[in-house]
Structure formats: C-alpha cells, structure tokens
Amino acid sequence: MLRVVVLGAAAGGGVPQWNCGCPVCRKARSENPELRSTQASIAVSADGAHWYLINASPDLRQQLIATPQLHPESGHLRHSPIAGVILTNGEIDAVAGLLSMREGSPFMLYAHERVLAILRSNSIFNVLGENNVKRQPIEADKAFEPALPDGSQSGIEILPFAVPGKGAWYLEGKAHPTGGDAAGDTLGLRILDKGSGKYFYFLAACARVTDDLKSRLAGAALVFFDGTVWRDDELIVQGLGTKTGQGMGHISMSGEHGAIESLAGLDIARKMFLHINNSNPALLSGSDERKQLEQAGWQIPADGTEITL
C-alpha cells in the first residue's frame, strides 16, 4: 500500500506570494484563506513509518510542522521519519528546502547527476554533511529502490524518466556545471509499491505532452501533473511577469496542446494538478477555468491531502 501526502501544490512563491496583489493573492490573504498553498512537494511511504519527500520546497519547514505523519517520534532527542529526498530538477522550488534539513538527521538524497552537480557547485549545500546525507545519482529509465535507514528495502520502486523541460532559471545565461540544457534537467517519476503493484506518476514540471509520455501515463491510478499556468501568456497579460509558460518550461492547462486536452482519454483514474502559479485563475473556486478543469476530471489538491493506493 502506498500512502501519499500532498505537502504543497503551489508554484514558486506559493499562494499568496509575499509581494503580490493579484486577485488570487488578495483573496487568499482575506476572504478566502482556503486558497493558501505552499510550494509543490509530496511525501510517499509504503509502510507509514518511513517517508520519502519528492522535492524539498522552500516551504519545507512549514510543511513538516503541518504534517503529523512527518513529525519526530516521541522519546527521541533527534528523530525524523524522513528516510530520503528525491529531486526531479534543480529549480529553487525543488532544492531550497534541503537547507531546512541541516540539523544532522541522516537521510538519502537522490537526484540526476546534473542536479547533484548544481548542489556541489554551491557551497551553501555543504551544510548537508555527506556523513549524514549520502548523495546517490539516479538515471533516466533506470529504476531504483530507495533504502531505509538500516539499509533494508523500502518496498518502493522509483523509475525516473526524462520529460520536456528546461534547466533551472537561475542558470540561464550561465554555464551549467555539466553543460547547457539537457536530458536530466527535468524528470518525471513513476512510483510503485512493490507489494501491491500499484503505482502513480509525479511530473511537477513538463513543457509538452509527447506520445511517449501519453503511453506511460495511460491507465495510471493517479497522476500529479504540472499545472503552472492556465494559458501560456497569463503572466504577461496580467502584468505579473515577462515570460510565457513555455519560456519557463511549463505546459498550459488549457488550449489545443495543453495538459487537459493532451491527457484526455488516457483512462487515468485520478488526475491532480500541482505547481500551480498564483496567476492561474483555475485556483478560484467557481471560476470558468475551474469548472472546465473539474468537468475534465481534474482536481487541485489542498495542502495536507492524503491519498492511499
């Protein structure tokens, strides 16, 4: 049995963003606190005692406090049920939370070599001493089983695979430690319970849906998918930014080649959007965009949502 907890569903900066006065952020601060969301991450466990984080968001400390499943056991001076962290990219949204895990509890860190190279190139991540935090490279299309703290099997198999995307934005125009944008900068994950054979997919970033990706996702029990923007130019139209969704490596929810249309008809039992930007009108309950999303069988999960497979 797999247990999955949504720690956060928002894109960079969360909802509300600290300096934003857009309609969504204004409502989240005042009359609609249910709109508030921390930055995208999930936790998964096969035994309910040992958990693996998928990405470590900048809001991680707040997320851990809000999630009883991830609290330390009583009777220990230092303890954490977190056995490991799996990174799907090197964006700030995915790695900054690692700095909140520097108090000496051991855990495994799994990431593509290109992402590990980013961490090595920035000495601030040296606070994660390698005696306590072992770094394990992972490869696209090569399944692995993350280890429990005692070295035994976790019962979870993770298959990383490359998806269309881009490198971290803070490296734009700069030399990547291992070269320019390439496969490995953005990964999707298939996460499988070896006992039951149940599995789900996690894609917090994806620039487009390819035929290969459709084949992977078809028939899945659950898919978490990139929901950053409703339409490609919404940041520009709303005066919130200068980049399109595609320019940031993110597909739109709507439109002819958007996620909703591209993933329709694939017999996915449960579809959830994650990494949703504050500019996205689908966040507003009752909006036309939200109605279209829900009519197509999609959900936007609240922080703390738990799903069992």
Where are these regions (language model features)?
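Glycine/Thr-rich phosphate-binding loops of Rossmann-like dinucleotide-binding domains
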Residues: 14, 62, 95-96, 233, ...
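Cap/insert and terminal regions of metallo-dependent hydrolase folds
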Residues: 184-186, 195-199, 207-305
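Residues at the starts of beta-strands that form the adenosine-phosphate
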Residues: 3, 50, 108, 134, ...
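Active-site metal-binding motif and surrounding structural segment of the metallo-beta-lactamase
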Residues: 49-111
